Amino acid sequence: MKALKRVIRMLLHTFLWPWRKAYRRRNGVAVQEERHELPNDAFLGLVGEKLAEGHTAVIWVKGYSMRPFIEFGRDRVKLAPFDELKVGDAVVAQIAPGHYVLHRIIQRDGERLTLQGDGNVRGVEHCLCGDVCGVVTEYIRPGRTLLASDKRLQRRIRLWRWLRPIRRYLLWLYRECI
């Protein structure tokens, strides 16, 4: 069992999270920055207004629903206004009055979008294209910035969507091994 766990951990690190391992090798000590947390409904409402004006915003991620691609307390994302939305894009959307989520589009049917977090096994949210505040253009990690349009990242996202039936077990291994 230990050998199997070790092999799976190696495969997960190789295909999904190589930047995390490289960061640990470069910097032995992680520095915790001081942050102030605001309620999502107030903060993301203001961010949505600025994005509607054409500005961009960088926000810290809260929660574990986008794990393993975005980690709570470690990663930030750069949000920007969008021209078009496609399946696979990570977006900030208002799914109910005052309730915002940062999730990935898994299905599009005209103006209706279906969203799901990468770390969610079940449960989806529905919204309209007009409810989307902004789209993620960059993933900012300590020591590295990844563009959302990066081909390697896009392949990993497609692979993760394809592995949806066994996602529960992969997430369990991720939590146990990391």
Label the predicted regions.
Residues 1-178:
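Extended hydrophobic leader/signal-anchor segments used for secretion and membrane insertion
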